[in-house]
Design a protein with these regions (language model features):
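Outer-membrane beta-barrel "beta-signal"
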Residues: 678, 820-822, 840-851
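Outer-envelope beta-barrel architecture signal
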Residues: 519-523, 533-537, 551-557, 578-584, ...
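A subset of solvent-exposed loop/turn segments in beta-rich extracellular surface proteins, enriched
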Residues: 535, 545-622, 638, 642-659
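Outer-membrane beta-barrel initiation region
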Residues: 441, 451-453, 464, 470-577, ...
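C-terminal outer-membrane beta-barrel translocator/porin domains of Gram-negative envelope proteins
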Residues: 515-517, 566-568, 597-599, 609-615, ...
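C-terminal catalytic region of ATP-dependent kinase domains
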Residues: 145-151, 257-427, 432-439, 445, ...
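Conserved ATP-binding subdomain of kinase catalytic cores across diverse folds
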Residues: 74-212, 245, 269-286, 292-302, ...
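Transmembrane beta-strands of outer-membrane beta-barrel pores
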Residues: 527-533, 543-545, 561-565, 586-594, ...
């Protein structure tokens, strides 16, 4: 059976390596008395950071030694801190507690060590729960993975920010004794008997001019008189790049407004600088970060390998907030930081760390930050160039006028005006060499779009209209695309030379700052094992582009290779509304690709005494299959497909195929086919008792292009049904039939059965029918020290047969068996099964994301 190893399967494999390569000896530090004003305490006990050489090579050393090194800090309780504080709420985004004192001043308390964006990946958001994973090796592994973060250098980062004229939050470290609080942090971790950091937080009650990021973005759309202080924001972001702080999520910012002339400028306030100076090492650990989609977490080095990649989490917000600034602002702020953060200031920043941790790692960081400082202007230029590749611009909810000037052969100019006042509120130049595409959102209001000029190599511009009564004046040219509501057709009918897309789909017209042009690449292992085919391993490479049109992506390419099956390709190109899709599938088989062949009919010999190779036929196969998919709903789809196929069976001297066909038979020559097909699939949830009822109907016609007389129509139908008997007991069944309407087909095109106790293609003919049924019992959870594990058992029964002209057979073939399934880390399901038949037994192993 086929299996595709998801990120979850990597985790299973990697955690096993963690278990067997780590030193798991447990120990506990002596309890520290609550009455001590100063205590010596480490973040982790020494046993938790004591690892073998093999573990360090595979998973890295990180900053692990710092986590078990005791430091001297004051001991506080919630009653003594700030004269007494109370818990306001859990700060889920920071895995901490928001505290308030009697003067209504706020601070954020969070344990040192713990968890980070590592567990905020899509995979861990779906599967990880601190309480469920408690006392498992995976939980210990995640805690160890956090040691890529230096636990103390946030103090130095805060000092560097203050020295650069940026916001700082007065970071401090304390010890919180046992029994000082019953609260936990957001992930369920106990907060007592730990080292904690305490930082000041802006007071929203007494400072109403402080906004959250989402509130800021809404405010900016109201009027261009509301602006971000781009100089300070760009300086903040360049400081992030200097210290390698990659965790700039929207929740990490607050915005303080101040009046300046007719405008309100919002200055950035940073909440957390804990993720600077990351140390990422270990062969398997680096690979795991890529698998989890966290490849932007990289080792802090003197020269960033990809400044765009390392700023993945902050890129969309940078695009939204810095559109008015050109490269001179970026390089100017980089120069300011370079001149301000002298060697003495950097040395002083790291001298503020707790005594006793001035080890080689701190010296390494100090050296690297000085080297990176000298390259900061180059880093700024490279990052600005990334922002300019596909800039996203917005108007306001007022009536705006957009002027796009394309007369210059080297540059494109965009200006924005407030129609009510005539004031120019935006003026930027874009290089044709560096800018590949521009998206311009009109937002609300009655906007006017003006485009003039025409040159040979024009930058594509997407004009996305809002709901107002918009007008257009455009000179002849190319590469202008207008997205307008259906109600705007009449206005655009008089506008020539542009591509027009009319749609009332809200997602097309609404501005979302997270919607930026980007792509993702991933590798997925691919494998097969059963007792018929044996092992075959390979991998898939997936390239997904997210452009303006996405449902949920713009297009996707998947290229895979498998040792037995060869190369496979799939391209998916969805429409704007996601209801239609154009797909391309292709296959180029390897020389090891084979079909089983036992002859035609329902009573063929199984050749149980012969080796498996005796009935295997090596076939070179090529297939190119474009298809059109039309979705009527999420569970109803119509597919129109056309395929061009090539087959050629290999001649051998000692196999069944050569006894069945003569040497000069057409089967051993290159055969070309065309296949036209239409299929319809539907699936419904009838009720809670019947959660799934689905069916597929397919009809088509195949023709041999070298012998047009050999053509045949065909039809297929299948039905699936799941019945939930109890919460843990389910009956599932699937029945399928195939019909060929004449005898002009080859053996690899024949109707066949899929009985789990027989080899593939064991019975083939002109017609076929088979059904399998399973009764599945969910056995619940299985306690173990590795990871949460759910398991169940199932028993199955299959029956089926084929019909072949001239054969009189009333025999129905059956197979029976069962197996067990295991669901690891709440995500990945492995299934082991063994089914028997009159031929023999067949063992199968499956690995996937469901039963």
């Amino acid at each position: 059976m086929k299996m595709r190893l998801s990120p979850a399967s990597y985790i299973v494999f990697l955690v096993m390596l963690f278990v067997f390569s780590a030193d798991m000896t447990a120990s506990v530090l002596p309890r520290v008395g609550e009455g001590d004003s100063l205590v010596r305490k480490s973040i982790y006990p020494p046993s938790a950071t004591r690892k073998s050489d093999l573990y360090n090579k595979l998973w890295g050393e990180h900053y692990r030694t710092l986590y078990s090194l005791p430091i001297t800090v004051p001991a506080v309780t919630l009653q003594s801190l700030w004269g007494g504080v109370k818990v306001v709420e859990q700060a889920a985004d920071f895995q901490g507690l928001l505290l308030e004192n009697n003067q209504q001043q706020l601070c954020l308390l969070k344990p040192l060590g713990g968890y980070t964006t590592f567990i905020e990946s899509k995979f861990f958001q779906e599967v990880y729960n601190k309480k469920v994973f408690k006392n498992t090796y995976l939980d210990q592994f995640i805690g160890d993975a956090y040691t890529i973060i230096n636990p103390y250098t946030f103090i130095s980062a805060d000092y560097l920010a203050r020295s650069s004229g940026l916001s700082s939050n007065n970071s401090r470290i304390f010890y919180l004794p046992e029994h000082s609080t019953r609260d936990t942090v957001a992930n369920g971790t106990s907060i007592e008997n730990k080292l904690v950091s305490v930082i000041d937080v802006p007071d929203f009650n007494t400072r109403p001019n402080i906004l959250l990021t989402e509130e800021l973005l809404d405010t900016l759309q109201a009027n261009k008189n509301f602006q971000v202080d781009q100089v300070l924001y760009i300086r903040e972001r360049l400081l992030d790049m200097l210290i390698g702080d990659w965790n700039k999520i929207p929740e990490n910012w607050n915005w303080l407004g101040r009046s300046e002339g007719d405008s309100i400028l919002y200055a950035p306030i940073v909440i957390d600088r804990n993720h600077a100076f990351t140390k990422v090492d270990g062969v398997l650990f680096k690979q795991m970060l890529r698998v989890l989609g966290l490849g932007f977490i990289v080792n802090y080095d003197a020269s960033p390998k990809s400044v765009r990649k390392e700023n993945t989490l902050g890129f969309a917000l940078d695009m939204a907030l810095t559109s008015q600034s050109d490269v001179s602002v970026w390089t100017g702020q980089a120069r300011f930081i370079r001149q301000t953060l002298t060697d003495s200031i950097i040395d002083k920043a790291f001298s503020r760390l707790p005594k006793g941790i001035e080890d080689k790692e701190i010296k390494r960081i100090t050296r690297i930050i000085k080297e990176r400082r000298e390259k900061l202007e180059v880093i700024a230029k490279n990052y600005f160039a990334s922002l300019q590749q596909t800039p996203v611009l917005t108007g306001t909810n007022r009536s705006d006028r957009f002027v796009i000037d394309r007369h210059n052969p080297d540059s494109l100019f965009i200006q924005m005006y407030d129609q009510q006042t005539g004031q120019r509120v935006f003026d930027r130049k874009y290089s044709r060499k560096k800018t590949k595409e521009i998206w311009l959102y009109g937002l609300e209001g009655d906007d006017r779009f003006e485009v003039s000029g025409r040159v040979n190599k024009e930058v594509p511009v997407f004009l996305i209209a809002g709901k107002g009564k918009n007008t257009y004046r455009m000179e002849p040219g190319h590469h202008i695309r207008v997205y307008e509501y259906e109600s705007g057709k009449a206005v655009l009918d008089t506008v020539p030379h542009v591509k027009k897309v009319f749609s009332d789909i809200p997602e097309i017209h609404q501005y979302d700052y997270n919607k930026i042009k980007h792509h993702k690449m991933s590798f997925t292992p691919w494998g097969i094992y059963d007792s018929d085919k044996g092992f075959s391993l390979g991998t898939f490479f997936t390239y997904t582009m997210y452009g303006f049109k996405r449902s949920p992506f713009t297009y996707q390419h998947r290229i895979g290779y498998n040792y037995i099956q060869g190369f496979v390709y799939q391209g998916i190109f969805p429409s704007y509304d996601g209801k239609k899709s154009f797909n391309i599938d292709a296959t180029i088989s390897s020389r090891r690709n084979f079909y089983n062949f036992f002859g035609f009919g329902n009573n063929t010999d199984g050749y149980k005494d012969a080796k498996k190779n005796y009935n295997r036929v090596h076939i070179r196969q090529f297939k190119l299959s474009p298809s059109f998919h039309l979705d009527f709903s999420e569970k109803e789809r119509l597919v129109l497909q056309a395929s061009w196929e090539m087959f050629k069976a290999k001649e051998t001297n000692d196999r069944f195929i050569n006894q069945f066909y003569p040497e000069d038979h057409r089967i051993f020559k290159t055969n070309l086919f065309i296949d036209l097909g239409l299929s319809f699939h539907t699936e419904k949830e009838i009720c809670s008792f019947i959660p799934k009822l689905g069916g597929t109907l397919t009809g088509g016609w195949k023709m041999n292009l070298k012998d047009a007389s050999r053509n045949f129509p065909y039809a297929e139908a299948s039905v699936e049904l799941d019945v939930k008997i109890t919460d843990r007991l389910t009956w599932a069944t699937m029945a399928k039939t195939q019909q060929l309407f004449n005898n002009k087909y080859e053996f690899y095109q024949a109707a066949s059965t899929e009985l789990r106790g027989y080899r593939d293609n064991r019975f083939i003919g002109k017609q076929s029918f088979y059904q399998y049924s399973d009764i599945r019992l969910d056995m619940g959870k299985l306690k173990n020290p590795f990871t949460p594990l759910k398991y169940g058992v199932f028993a199955g029964f299959d029956y089926g047969r084929v019909w072949f002209p001239g054969e009189q057979s009333k025999r129905w073939h059956t197979s029976y068996g069962g197996g067990i399934w295991l669901t690891l880390i709440n995500k990945i399901t492995t299934k082991y099964s063994c089914f028997g038949s009159t031929d023999s037994f067949r063992f199968m192993f499956e690995l996937g994301l469901g039963f």
